[in-house]
UniProtKB/Swiss-Prot annotation:
Residues 95-171 form the PRC barrel domain. An accessory protein needed during the final step in the assembly of 30S ribosomal subunit, possibly for assembly of the head region. Essential for efficient processing of 16S rRNA. May be needed both before and after RbfA during the maturation of 16S rRNA. It has affinity for free ribosomal 30S subunits but not for 70S ribosomes. This is Ribosome maturation factor RimM. One of its GO terms (cellular component) is cytoplasm. It comes from Rhodococcus erythropolis (strain PR4 / NBRC 100887). Pfam families: PRC, RimM. Residues 169-190 are annotated as: Disordered. Belongs to the RimM family. The keyword 4Fe-4S does not apply. GO terms for biological process: ribosomal small subunit biogenesis; rRNA processing. The PRC barrel domain binds ribosomal protein uS19. The lineage of its organism: Bacteria, Bacillati, Actinomycetota, Actinomycetes, Mycobacteriales.
């Protein structure tokens, strides 16, 4: 299975540097000088190899210089390129409570009483922590966002293909937080 470890967001400067959105826990290894990256444009299947010539942090962003990319035009042509690895290249985790995103995607989500909620379609990473994006059973669109925290996610079994949750009241309510349904209208005060 192909996993994205970075995406070229844009060019930086006039010497061909690239701003890369990092999607790996090990950027210092994946993007080290001399590393060979495999990249492709979104929705394309042809992979091209790129050798890292230089890598540096700049204001919290990763800047890369790749061999053969020497000016802004070359760099702009790579905008949107996804750097990928094969999941078989990943080391298995020794921590039973640590998972790769691709291991969680597709798992069935059930309540502690056994009620099926849906399945994990994506793991989102935010400054506040990880969220599981859940597609409800029987629905073809829309999503529920569930914080991936021990207080809500009580267990994960990759072997059984199940994420067990015990959400607080209202978290699974589709109208949760929708102010248009509140009873705070002043129509009686005419």
């Amino acid at each position: 299975m192909e996993l994205v470890v970075g995406r070229v967001a844009k060019s930086h400067g006039i010497k061909g540097e690239l701003v890369v959105e990092v999607r790996t826990d090990e950027p210092e290894d994946r993007f080290a000088v001399g590393s060979v990256l495999r990249g492709r444009k979104p929705r394309e299947s042809t992979l091209k190899s790129y050798t890292v010539e230089a890598a540096r942090d700049h204001s919290g962003r990763l800047l890369l210089r790749l061999e053969g990319v020497s000016d802004r035009g070359d760099a702009d042509a790579l905008r949107g390129t996804l750097f990928v690895i094969d999941s078989s290249e990943l080391e298995p985790s020794d921590d039973p409570d640590e998972f790769y995103d691709h291991e969680l995607e597709g798992l069935k989500v059930v309540l502690t009483d056994g009620t099926e909620v849906g399945s994990v379609i994506e793991v989102l990473h935010s400054a506040a922590g990880e969220l599981l994006s859940i597609r409800r059973t029987g629905e073809t669109s829309g999503e529920l966002l569930i914080p991936f925290v021990a207080a809500i996610v009580t267990s994960v079994s990759i072997a059984d293909g199940v994420v067990m949750i015990e959400p607080p009241e209202g978290l699974l309510d589709p109208d949760f937080g929708d102010k248009s349904n509140s009873d705070n209208s002043n129509s009686d005060n005419d």
